[in-house]
Amino acid sequence: MSKDDTILVWFLLHEAWLKNALEFWGFLLDVLGKETSEIKEEVEANAAEVNNAAVLNKEAAEPEAAEIDEAMQPNEETAQIGENQVTTTILATKRAAWARLKAHHKEMEGIHMRDLFAEDPKRFEHFHAQACGLTMDYSKHRIRSGTVDLLTGLARESDLDGWIGRMMSGERINNTEDRAALHAALRYGAPGAFPAGEADVMPGVRDVLGRIRRFADEVQSGTWRGYTGHPIETIVNIGIGGSDLGPVMATRALGAYQHERLTGHFVSNLDATQLMEALNGLDPATTLFIIASKTFTTQETLTNANSARKWFVERAGEDAVAKHFVAVSTALDRTSAFGISPANVFEFWDWVGGRYSLWSAIGLSIATLIGTDNFEELLAGGHDMDEHFRTAPYDKNLPVLMGLLDLWYRDFFGAQSHVVLPYDYALRSFPDYLQQLEMESNGKRVTRDGEAVDYPTGSIIWGGPGNNGQHAFYQLMHQGKTLIPSDFIVPMRCQYSTGEHDDAMLSNALAQTEALMKGKNEKEVRQALIESGMTGKELEAALPHRVLPGNQPSTTLVYEHLTPRILGSLIALYEHKVFTGSVIWGLDAFDQWGVELGKQMAKVIMPELRSPREITDHDSSTNGLINLIRKGRGIS
């Protein structure tokens, strides 16, 4: 586009803005869309950079011609980071599709979902999708079919297909650490090589999986015996972050599949209370510890591991350590120094991020407790969702739809949090697991190439068992002033199914989705109060307290029965939902530099807590707290 053309566009846009002519706005956007398509075709024909256009700067009320000209620059380029080439994108707000969505949001923000259901009696039929044993109802969202078209258009303009291909082919898309994100390879059950670009990772993956199978089978069969010759009865997994959250969630979710002789405990917190509660009443002769730390230097894990080792040695002796401690790590020198035989160390790779690691040897505790056949079914479910994510069209693609809806509310409606509500008690730890997955992945303020974003990214994830939540935080969802999109996760049958329990649980889940959508308006409340016998001032006083505005969006995920395979698909569904958002926001979803600063500061503060001198090296608040604790502990 020439500069004269750009100036002409600016004058037309300025005129349209003053007249508030929405029809002309849409026409102008269509014109720009056609021009940018022509530019893209020309550039592709010349084997140059791909060129997508944007028509508006997100914050500009009256954009200057120069700003429009800038938005028309090529939106994809290749940055050199070390030896790794990473494709980066422009800010999402500079995309033409974003501008269209912004205009569309103005049309949608005042519409109640009651009206959307009234205008389309077959709305469920039009807004649900199925894959991998999951049915996703997204009809209770503040969208029309045109909204989905615009959102999927944004995904295409952001090159989501290309990024899916880069991830699945082993490109080092974690550009800040120059690493691949190949967790999909861990659940690739087909024969032959995983379709990764640089090397076939499957021989190593299959070798570790085989070792996991042999170990878990020995423990479950009673072949693995402790220092007294008794079989193992208790597994204590010591880790933190992804080395804890994933195994905790999966073993609780699949408790119905757990070996009848085995019990599992998980320790992650630096507060010794958690470790002591886990060890209380345990017999060292029948207890096996799994120490999960890639570097074997993680402070929380090593502190707990050393305390557990001390507890064990005091009761069983030093020579018994080798039969009761195994590790998931790559640091053979450190695990050997700890007393763990190299034969009992299970490795994983730097292309396995912590929050994606339950599929790897970090899942050793899962496989040991539920059995390797069930663990491999978990992997197969993840692979099922990988294939769906990779091949399904966007309007039928569960992870893509969930990621786009999340972005729709986060960036256009201003929603800050997202609540996850499993009506399957087995999934009680799933919201905790998703907190790390979503907030650590997309809680970023700069794009892959370090440019500050000018839009919100990531959501605050929270939640808990839905039936319990009804008696706790649902009040805020129904009558508060905050928009809170929600996910209802609903089984047709629970793991320990009884007709009465299941019907009560299902009726509550479905009623809540309807109540959040419809609410109860003033007319309906007034009629109900009159029918109850209330009149006059009493009625008028009660009326505003009984109104529920509704219009709270929700997705409902339904499955027949929670199995290892369904759980695998559900986990991978959310992984790919998160990745979809990261692509459109332009983020590196696989690093987590924000967690490092606090760790570094803790190393400074730890010796200061025992220092004989008054601490003055920090800000007044931190100094005051350190000195308060020193004095309270008798150090002066």
Whereabouts are the PLM-identified features?
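Amphipathic, low-complexity, repeat-rich surface-exposed segments
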Residues: M1-E83
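Extended, charge-enriched "interface" segments that sit outside catalytic cores
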Residues: I90-A97, H104, E109-F117, P121-T228, ...
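Hydrophobic alpha-helical scaffolding
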Residues: L91, D137, H141, E198, ...
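Short helix/loop capping segments that flank catalytic or ligand/cofactor-binding pockets
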Residues: E125-H126, L245-V248, L275-M276, Q299-T301, ...
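Glycine-rich phosphate-binding loops that contact phosphosugars or nucleotide phosphates
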Residues: R214-G222, T228-A392, V604
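Active-site phosphate/pyrophosphate-binding segments
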Residues: W311-T498, G519, L548-G550, K599-M606, ...
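Substrate-recognition/cap regions that form aromatic- and gly/pro-loop-enriched pockets
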Residues: H478, V490-G568, A572, V578
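C-terminal accessory domains/tails appended to large, multi-domain proteins
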Residues: P549-Q552, T556-W585, F590, L597, ...
